[in-house]
């Protein structure tokens, strides 16, 4: 009996560290996706016509906030980053709090909501990136990635980070749900196992 309590406490501590590491990775991925896309901007000057021998130039700017899907992407990634930051702080500094009952359920529900949010944002941005890269002949939308290559490369990097965040949040959500079945005092510094002979 005492040995099983010690084993459970050791396993609980190890799973807490893994969950904390996953949250740190998810926080990094979603925050970097939000920052890269939020700072994504490229300005270029093109010749749009000629009057005689004089070229007429126009300056165009590609920014993330020109597309509502990219704005949603930045906001959603920032929200998921904030959620993970709160959960990390709670896990590190909330040593006296027991994660049982309603608290575990609320964390699991929030994790699932954040998986849904970041997945929707990443897929919406991926759709717009596809249109930007290849255009749409039926709607007569021209592609822009052949003209704004840096803008598209930064957007692709943000999408990769966001999809990494989606995968990490799926794993975190599964771990949160599994903790509902076997609740423990995750990362509790005050609880120490007692050995009873």
Swiss-Prot record:
Domain of life: Eukaryota
A Pfam family reported for this protein in Swiss-Prot or TrEMBL: CASP_dom
Cytoplasmic compartment spans: 2-17, 91-106, 178-197
Keyword Cell cycle among UniProt keywords: no
Topology class, membrane: Multi-pass membrane protein
One GO term describing the cellular component: plasma membrane
Cross-referenced InterPro entries: CASP/CASPL, CASP_dom, CASPL
Modification sites for N-acetylalanine: 2
Entry's family note: Belongs to the Casparian strip membrane proteins (CASP) family.
Descriptive protein name: CASP-like protein 1B1
Taxonomic source organism: Arabidopsis thaliana
Lineage: Eukaryota, Viridiplantae, Streptophyta, Embryophyta, Tracheophyta
């Amino acid at each position: 009996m005492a040995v099983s309590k010690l084993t459970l406490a050791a396993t609980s501590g190890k799973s807490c560290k893994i969950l904390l590491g996953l949250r740190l990775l998810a926080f990094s991925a979603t925050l970097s996706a939000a920052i890269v896309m939020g700072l994504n901007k490229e300005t270029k000057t093109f010749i749009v016509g000629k009057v005689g021998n004089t070229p007429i130039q126009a300056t165009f700017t590609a920014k993330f906030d020109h597309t509502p899907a990219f704005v949603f992407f930045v906001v959603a990634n920032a929200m998921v980053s904030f959620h993970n930051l709160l959960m990390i702080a709670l896990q590190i500094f909330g040593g006296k709090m027991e994660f049982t009952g309603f608290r575990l359920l609320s964390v699991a529900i929030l994790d699932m909501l954040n998986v849904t949010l970041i997945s929707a944002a990443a897929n919406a941005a991926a759709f717009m990136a596809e249109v930007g890269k290849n255009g749409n002949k039926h709607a007569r939308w021209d592609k822009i990635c052949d003209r704004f290559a840096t803008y598209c490369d930064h957007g692709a990097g943000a999408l990769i980070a966001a999809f990494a965040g989606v995968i990490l949040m799926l794993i975190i959500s599964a771990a949160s749900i599994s903790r509902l079945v076997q609740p423990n005092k995750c990362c509790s510094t005050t609880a120490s196992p007692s050995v009873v002979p």
